[in-house]
Amino acid sequence: TVMGAQVKEAAVMLPLYTFCIEFVLGGFKRKDGEWNRPILTLYGILLGLPMVAGLMWVSARMLHFDVVTRMMTEARVMFDYMHWTLLPNLDSLTLFHDDIVPSKGLLDPSTTLAAIVGIAALLAVALWQRKSRPMLALGILWFFSGHLLTGTVIPLILVFEHRNYFPSAGLLLSIAALIPQFNSAWNARAISVGTGCLFLFYAFTTHLRSMEWSSPINLAASDASKRPNSSASQYEYARILLTTTKNGDPEPMRQKAFAILERMAADPNAEATNNQLLIVYANELKRPVDPKWWDSMIAKFSSRKPTSTEATALVALLKCYDAAFCSRDIGHMRAALEAATSHSGGYAMLYAAFGRFAAKYLDNRELAELQFQRAIARAPSDPEYLLQYAELLIESGRFDEAESIIQQLHTLNRFDLLNSQLARIEEGLVRAKSNQTTH
């Protein structure tokens, strides 16, 4: 498990998969029928302690919808995964599925309740068939176990079909476990023909999908056409168009990209990443920046907590300012940062970005200090925010407080990874003290 986790985080689920095997095939019993206490203790440690730690970690790190909303939505998504695995529809096979509307209640949409009941029924079947059809039970448990890490409370994107690598094996195991039930000669022939047709269908669908993957522009265009309301699909298509030419002329592609981005920027349900890309490329191509792009971005940040991709995009836009690559619209940038950081449980990188912006462009050290303090409170073990805060304190002449922050950084300097940053900031502190004494 430890070795696998160095390559792929999903390897941490290996103890849960073996737990399912033990539950179905052994029942945690010894040969004499008594409980196998060492096995129970082992799984209590391997599964119980990480579960408690994980729940504590995610308690304040949710996306802009709460845990209940996420869990209700994921119930519907589980059946989408089953559909895409067993009977894939080319129109539904895309990289992004962010246009799936989160469930707002058990009957909004109505399929939410049906999905929850369906999952409960499948788990009940697994328990019921554990002894008579163990492979059927194990396949069902493996499918849901495979989604326990990414499809429950951890704040990841709601839908990502590539999460089905191992869970799909559980589905196929369950289907394979049912085939022996049809053991007459006629049924055997029917099953052989049906299986052959199914494999031909899978092969043909895979061939069509591979054609869509033939080039980045083909894949992006295909996904965007299938999901016109997917912010991520439209963003990716526009991004690729902006770096593509048609017969050596980039302008037709650029016009198409800007039309896509402007439509998504005006959509209140689309991510603000589209607005950010519009602003950055308008600067790069020496085009005017429409104030409406800023206004709709600010409105999106005001109405809900930014997603992680939106937070990253806004920080990147500020870096575009720092590099003097983008024209500096200080008023709009301040409004965007204020809106993005107005929600509880925000991202530390946004608070730190606001702090840098306040210090550099507003000359407001009080506001900058407040934002850095918020960043450190959200990520107290991240040395980057402490380093930036210490620099601000040194520039403000508050040397004692800066030294206190530097001491905190020394405690975080594991394996001497921060030596160069600490040396730089300590030299700056000594120089600032010397300059103050001289003057």
Which residues make up each language-model segment?
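Polytopic membrane enzymes that build or remodel cell-surface glycoconjugates and lipids
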Residues: 1-275, 280-292, 306-311
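C-terminal luminal/periplasmic domains and tails of membrane-associated envelope-modifying transferases
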Residues: 217-439
